[in-house]
Design a protein with these regions (language model features):
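C-terminal transmembrane beta-barrel domains of outer membrane proteins
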Residues: 1-156
Length: 156
C-alpha cells in the first residue's frame, strides 16, 4: 500500500499420515491451532478437531489435535508514530482428523461440514518495531465457534 499502511496475510495447510504399522501419527507431531501465533482469539489447543468440543476438563486440550490443518490470517497494519504500529486482524482455521474417531464425534474432515467448522476470530493490536525485533500485544475476540452452541448467527 504505502510506507505507513501495510497488509500482511498467511495461509497454512498441513496433512499428516501415519506410516509403517502405526494407525495414527504420534501425538507430538499432530497439528493444533489457537494462540498468539495462530488464531489469536482462542487459547492454544482450544479449537477442534472439527466440530468436536470436549467436556469441560483441565486436560481437555490433550484431545484437541488433528492430522489435517487449515489456517489463514489477514492483518492490516498502520503507523501510529515512528516505530509504533497499530493492527487489526482476522484469523480463521481449525484442525481435523483424517480418520473417524468414535471418541471424538464430528472431528473427521468432511467437505460438507468444512465451512461450518472454521473458527473465526478478530481483534486489534499494537506493535513496537525495532527493525530486527517486533514486540506486539494483541487482543482478540471469537466471531464463530466451530462446534454447536445451540445458538444461531456468527457471533456465538
Amino acid at each position: 500500500m504505502d510506507k505507513n499502511n501495510k497488509i500482511a496475510s498467511r495461509v497454512a495447510l498441513g496433512a499428516l499420515f501415519a506410516y509403517g504399522n502405526a494407525t495414527i501419527a504420534p501425538y507430538s507431531e499432530q497439528f493444533y491451532v489457537g494462540g498468539a501465533n495462530s488464531i489469536r482469539a482462542f487459547t492454544v489447543r482450544s479449537i477442534g478437531p472439527g466440530g468436536y468440543h470436549p467436556a469441560e476438563s483441565r486436560y481437555s486440550y490433550l484431545d484437541q489435535t488433528g492430522t489435517f490443518r487449515f489456517e489463514a490470517n489477514v492483518e492490516y497494519r498502520f503507523r501510529i508514530f515512528k516505530s509504533i504500529w497499530g493492527a487489526t486482524f482476522l484469523d480463521a482455521g481449525n484442525v481435523w482428523l483424517m480418520r473417524k474417531d468414535e471418541a471424538r464425534p464430528n472431528s473427521q474432515l468432511e467437505l460438507k461440514t468444512f465451512p461450518k467448522q472454521i473458527a473465526l476470530g478478530t481483534g486489534v493490536g499494537i506493535r513496537y518495531d525495532m527493525d530486527i525485533l517486533v514486540f506486539r500485544l494483541d487482543f482478540g475476540i471469537p466471531l464463530h465457534l466451530p462446534y454447536d452452541t445451540e445458538r444461531s448467527g456468527y457471533y456465538n
